[in-house]
């Protein structure tokens, strides 16, 4: 797998691979040279109810990020609270009553940009099993997030285990080119239908 990935990946390209538990660590060990960091997908919905008496319920999956050289990185900014203001704090008299005398308050000094850089925790709700077309299907929004983070419009994205074609749908939604590979013919037909090929 790595021989082919390293052959086709651009110098500024990123390889994003999903994995869980033991397989995640084996994946990293398979190419420590190119491994850079991991992201954690918080699925919101939990699984593992049959083992709930023996281990915690699971609600995350890891995403291993590999690359040769610093890839394209377009941080997907998120909304947050404004930063706290600097300088002298001015206390304002806001209310007077008979019981507690006078109340004082510090006015809201927060100002500036509310944009925050992304963290390594990505919160995208997993599809309920009744909505899934394919057993390991990812939310389109999660794949759009990764695609927008590591590529620009008109770039090409490869998914060599494309399943039902969710990555292809995300590429269409974000104006990227898509190459998908699937070994199972029945699943491939589902992907073709979703992608209107």
Task: List each language-model region with its residue ranges.
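Core catalytic lobe of class I
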Residues: 1-190
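Short, conserved SAM-binding/catalytic segment
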Residues: 192-197
């Amino acid at each position: 797998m790595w021989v082919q990935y390293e052959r086709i990946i651009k110098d500024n390209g990123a390889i994003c691979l999903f994995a869980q538990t033991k397989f995640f660590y084996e994946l990293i060990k398979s190419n420590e040279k190119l491994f850079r960091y991991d992201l954690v997908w918080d699925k919101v919905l939990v699984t593992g109810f049959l083992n709930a008496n023996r281990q915690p319920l699971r609600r995350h999956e890891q995403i291993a990020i590999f690359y040769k050289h610093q890839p394209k990185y377009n941080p997907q900014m998120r909304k947050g609270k404004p930063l706290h203001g600097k300088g002298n704090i001015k206390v304002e008299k806001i209310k007077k009553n008979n019981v507690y005398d006078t109340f004082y308050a510090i006015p809201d000094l927060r100002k500036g940009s509310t944009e925050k850089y992304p963290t390594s925790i990505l919160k995208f709700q997993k599809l309920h099993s009744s909505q899934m077309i394919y057993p390991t299907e990812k939310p389109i929004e999660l794949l759009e997030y990764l695609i927008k983070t590591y590529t620009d419009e008109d770039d090409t994205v490869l998914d060599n285990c494309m399943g039902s074609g969710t990555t292809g749908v995300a590429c269409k939604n974000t104006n990227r080119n898509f190459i998908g590979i699937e070994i199972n013919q029945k699943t491939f037909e589902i992907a073709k239908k979703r992608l209107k090929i």
